[in-house]
């Protein structure tokens, strides 16, 4: 997640990135091995045994190292220090767990649990990245089976790989956490996490993660919903953005810092909505919207909506980077700072994901009452449609090398564009028929359709 673990159907080059980014993706055996393995399917121990010898003959490519991937576990089989299946109130408790693949606390069977002023701690590394990332095994607090867990005034910590702090999985499973401190120290250990239509709502939180692949707010396989309000969010690990969404994540009035990653990432047909917040990222790009085709996120339109925020990236990439997907971005009234890059928007293929020649980015960017500074670029298989309204402004060049497949621009009468370099667009729709809202500044503007 969070760039968080690995995904199937990826080239080796993408595996290296995803390891540093999100998930340790699972190896997919070549087709010739799949045929050989199918002959062993009747063996009762197949799901747990590793083949002792390879099949005869020469496969078309080398066999990846590592165990055969297993099916995700059923969360009902998970064990923990405290497992509640009925309604209960807990206060002033210390609940900890030190055993691998166990949870400190599990709520299940539609239990309604209230927890106040308690301490939860988890150590003991996961032995299954899939189970911990997708189903919440080894998390500190886990909600399943339509349970509702309400947490107030507590402390939640973990120091083991694959130990997410607060994890809800399965439709109807809801965790509400308020006035609570959360701190995870190891890899793949996110703050608030939801999968398979689970929901986590947070308010007045301090969340700190130190490990790689450990976003403070995250959703993963099967989608999930996260809301966060009035939270202080800090990540320091590689591939640990403040927000990583393969579901729907909404954050309001947060302060956030990703010391070794992007501000936010949207994968597939999912969304981030960010309002009234102050967030900063330091690596790669400001925001990335993409599709990995790993199976964790459905294909469709990736969406980012940001309104009334302070958005800062110290990265050298683009403020917004779109690849291998169709995306829609709405920017309204944000203060955007990009001190180390002149690239505002980039839509382009990325060799780590998708099929060569078909993995471009396709972005619709709507700006309302928004000041934009920087260049807009796209490669030969990518497109950008920029729509500026309500007094928006752009200071920058568009497609200055004239290499993009297509970039179009719409300007309302009260919006302006000041060129900083020669620019080439497919079409220009301007409500100001005099063109006085476009300042060439000595540069050339070429409109292909005119």
Language model feature labels by segment:
Residues 1-32:
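Bacterial Sec-dependent N-terminal signal peptides
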Residues 25-45:
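Sec-dependent N-terminal signal peptides of Gram-positive bacterial secreted proteins and lipoproteins
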Residues 48-128, 445:
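N-terminal segments that cap or nucleate solenoid repeat domains
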Residues 84-92, 112-117, 148-153, 174-180, ...:
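All-beta strand scaffolds that present successive hydrophobic residues in beta-strands
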Residues 399-406, 419-430, 449:
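Surface-exposed loop/turn positions within long extracellular repeat scaffolds
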Residues 441-450:
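Extracellular, surface-exposed repeat architectures
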């Amino acid at each position: 997640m969070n760039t968080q673990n690995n995904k199937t159907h990826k080239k080796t080059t993408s595996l290296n990135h995803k390891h540093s980014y999100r998930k340790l993706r699972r190896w997919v055996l070549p087709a010739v091995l799949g045929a050989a393995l199918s002959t062993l399917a009747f063996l009762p121990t197949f799901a747990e045994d590793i083949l002792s010898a390879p099949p005869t003959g020469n496969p078309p490519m080398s066999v990846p190292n590592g165990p055969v991937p297993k099916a995700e576990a059923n969360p009902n089989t998970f064990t923990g220090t405290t497992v509640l299946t009925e309604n209960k109130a807990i206060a002033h408790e210390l609940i900890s767990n030190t055993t691998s693949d166990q949870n400190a606390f599990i709520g299940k069977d539609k239990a309604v649990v209230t927890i106040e002023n308690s301490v939860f701690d988890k150590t003991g590394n996961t032995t299954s990245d899939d189970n911990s990332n997708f189903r919440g095994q080894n998390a500190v607090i886990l909600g399943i089976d339509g349970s509702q867990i309400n947490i107030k005034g507590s402390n939640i910590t973990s120091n083991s790989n694959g130990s997410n702090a607060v994890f809800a999985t399965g439709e109807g499973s809801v965790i509400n956490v308020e006035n609570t401190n959360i701190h995870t120290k190891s890899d793949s250990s996110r703050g608030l996490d939801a999968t398979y239509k689970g929901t986590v709502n947070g308010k007045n939180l301090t969340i700190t993660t130190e490990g790689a692949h450990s976003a403070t707010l995250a959703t993963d396989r099967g989608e999930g919903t996260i809301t966060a309000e009035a939270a202080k969010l800090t990540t320091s690990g590689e591939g640990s953005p403040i927000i990583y969404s393969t579901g729907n994540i909404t954050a309001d009035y947060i302060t956030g810092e990703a010391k070794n990653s992007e501000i936010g990432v949207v994968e597939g047909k999912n969304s981030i909505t960010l309002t009234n917040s102050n967030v900063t990222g330091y690596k790669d790009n400001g925001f990335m919207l993409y599709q990995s085709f790993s199976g964790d996120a459905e294909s469709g339109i990736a969406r980012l909506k940001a309104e009334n925020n302070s958005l800062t990236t110290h990265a050298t990439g683009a403020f917004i980077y779109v690849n291998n997907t169709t995306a829609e971005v709405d920017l309204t009234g944000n203060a955007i700072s990009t001190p180390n890059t002149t690239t505002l928007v980039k839509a382009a293929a990325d060799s780590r994901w998708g099929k060569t020649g078909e993995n471009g980015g396709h972005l619709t960017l709507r700006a309302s009452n928004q000041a934009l500074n920087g260049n807009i670029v796209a490669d030969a298989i990518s497109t950008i449609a920029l729509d500026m309204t309500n007094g928006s402004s752009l200071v920058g060049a568009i497609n200055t090398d004239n290499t993009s497949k297509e970039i179009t621009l719409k300007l309302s009468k009260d919006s302006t564009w000041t060129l900083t370099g020669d620019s080439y667009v497919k079409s220009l729709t301007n409500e100001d028929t005099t063109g006085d809202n476009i300042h060439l500044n000595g540069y050339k503007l070429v409109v292909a359709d005119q």
